A protein has these predicted regions:
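Donor/substrate-binding cores of folate-linked one-carbon enzymes
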Residues: 1-80
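Short helix-capping and hinge/turn segments at secondary-structure transitions, especially at repeat
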Residues: 55-65, 86, 102-109
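An anion-binding loop in the catalytic cleft
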Residues: 90-207
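Short, flexible active-site loop motifs that bind/organize anionic cofactors or intermediates
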Residues: 31, 87, 182
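Acyl-group handling in specialized metabolite and lipid biosynthesis
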Residues: 79-92
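Short amphipathic alpha-helical segments
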Residues: 28, 84-86, 172-174
Length: 207
């Protein structure tokens, strides 16, 4: 998800001395949805993996299993997920950050800093610049992003609405839809904004 892949999958293989180098037996592909999260993909892979294990055992028992050598090309291994990986670099593009948010949901989660506190971001959408450049309204006050806009420093809030706010990235803006503050439950951004003040020009990412 983080790397923007559209397909993943599960493979059963024969054990040997190497790391994931044994002959392949069966495999199945799983398409990655546009709104896929690490948690939803984990559940899909777990279900597919269990079914594939049963199918593989039957094939071995019936002596119909076909063992296929892996390609000679270098193997790419996925890096371990760590909490530090979730620290959002707002200089990256909105698309990259959205993928990070989805890929690290539910563990270890993507996060940024606000007033010296960690704010986890559980749901966000990458949006074109112009979608957050329009005049928006929060309560009885009107806000406009004209004073910030696409020339704002990455991490800067460029617009605030009743149910979301947009943060400038290195390319595009990220609309924040679900967050969590320390000691609090996850909440949609509309609920968050009723208890926390977010204004245009505010900068996220500073510890």
């Amino acid at each position: 998800i983080i790397e923007g892949e559209s397909v993943t999958g599960v493979t059963t293989m024969q054990m040997d001395e190497g790391l994931d180098t044994g002959d392949m037996i069966l495999k199945t592909e799983i398409p990655i949805a546009e709104d896929e999260t690490g948690e939803s993909l984990h559940d899909k892979l777990a279900e597919a993996g269990a079914a594939l294990c049963v199918k593989t055992l039957h094939a071995i028992e019936n002596k119909t299993a076909v063992f296929e050598k892996q390609p000679e090309s270098p193997t790419a291994y996925a890096k371990m997920l760590t909490k530090d990986l979730g620290n959002i670099d707002w200089a990256k593009s909105a698309v990259q950050i959205e993928r990070l948010v989805r890929g690290l949901n539910s563990w270890p989660s993507a996060y940024t800093h606000r007033d010296g506190k960690v704010m986890k971001i559980w749901k966000a959408l990458a949006k074109p610049q112009e979608e957050c450049a329009e005049q928006t309204e929060l309560g009885s006050e009107e806000h406009t992003a004209q004073k910030t806009g696409k020339n704002a420093m990455p991490g800067t809030v460029v617009s605030v609405a009743k149910d979301s706010f947009c943060i400038q990235t290195g390319d595009g803006v990220l609309r924040i839809l679900e967050v969590q503050m320390p000691g609090k439950k996850r909440m949609d951004t509309g609920s968050f904004l009723r208890g926390y003040k977010v204004e245009e020009g505010m900068v996220f990412g500073r510890e």
